Amino acid sequence: AQSVPYGISQIKAPALHSQGYTGSNVKVAVIDSGIDSSHPDLNVRGGASFVPSETNPYQDGSSHGTHVAGTIAALNNSIGVLGVAPSSALYAVKVLDSTGSGQYSWIINGIEWAISNNMDVINMSLGGPTGSTALKTVVDKAVSSGIVVAAAAGNEGSSGSTSTVGYPAKYPSTIAVGAVNSANQRASFSSAGSELDVMAPGVSIQSTLPGGTYGAYNGTSMATPHVAGAAALILSKHPTWTNAQVRDRLESTATYLGSSFYYGKGLINVQAAAQ
């Protein structure tokens, strides 16, 4: 049997599914640790690896990318879980190794691949405490080329009035995503700061894991693919909308939850965003 993870319902994705919008013809690059393409609940259409020691993008030694991918696009079938945009086209862009770490040069190469291969949405459930000029340049290039870029705000919690949002989420051109639980409370680990844009479910998120299995993870890494999937749903309903329009709709229709320093504009509501 197939279960619908709570986060899918919390962002109101099923309302769009019932209208017939499931992300068809929208290309989503999962810039991460790879995706296990043999998983029966995933359909990976392509990809590339920029990790010198791990050349196969369709293997995922850390399980992180496979989990992220399932939240975006786990198939609507009789097994496992359901993703936000189950018909969207997943691309595995490996920039993190099996320990979950990577170099900015690998990430930059992955973003360049996404631009060259006409991706519509980029999911970056990754980040670090310092940025780089080259990273900012390529992220801005992706956005100016029309791609919706969702990035994890980070799992550093809050630190008084100091921003704990990581890079690349801290760059204004990205949609910086924080995490809430099923009761719309901010996760204690979710980074805070003026750069935070929106919130999505990121606590006990059930999704796909390598080897045809499933499991629950926590993190802003789990919240971000809800936003990437939401962007794919919106674009499948409104294929002529620009990335700026998609972002504006996600932010302007979000449900207010509290101070923007901790919650950004609030919880995304993809049903309202895609009106």
Swiss-Prot record:
The protein's required cofactors: Ca(2+)
Further comment: Secretion of subtilisin is associated with onset of sporulation, and many mutations which block sporulation at early stages affect expression levels of subtilisin. However, subtilisin is not necessary for normal sporulation.
Signal as UniProt keyword: no
GO molecular function: metal ion binding; serine-type endopeptidase activity
Ranges of residues in domain Peptidase S8: 5-274
Protein name: Subtilisin
Cofactor note: Binds 2 calcium ions per subunit.
Coiled-coil stretches: none
Subcellular location: Secreted
Biological process, per Gene Ontology: proteolysis; sporulation resulting in formation of a cellular spore
Alphabetical UniProt keywords: Calcium, Hydrolase, Metal-binding, Protease, Secreted, Serine protease, Sporulation
Function: Subtilisin is an extracellular alkaline serine protease, it catalyzes the hydrolysis of proteins and peptide amides.
Enzyme Commission no: 3.4.21.62
Catalytic reaction list: Hydrolysis of proteins with broad specificity for peptide bonds, and a preference for a large uncharged residue in P1. Hydrolyzes peptide amides
Enzyme's top EC category: hydrolase
Keyword NAD in record: no
Gene3D superfamilies assigned to the protein according to its UniProt record, in alphabetical order: Peptidase S8/S53 domain
Binding positions for Ca(2+) 2 per the UniProt entry: 169, 171, 174
Any single Gene Ontology cellular-component annotation: extracellular region
Species, as recorded: Bacillus pumilus (Bacillus mesentericus)
Active site annotation, chain numbering: 32, 64, 221
Encoding gene per record: apr
Record-stated family: Belongs to the peptidase S8 family.
Xref: Pfam families: Peptidase_S8
Positions annotated to bind Ca(2+) 1: 2, 41, 75, 77, 79, 81
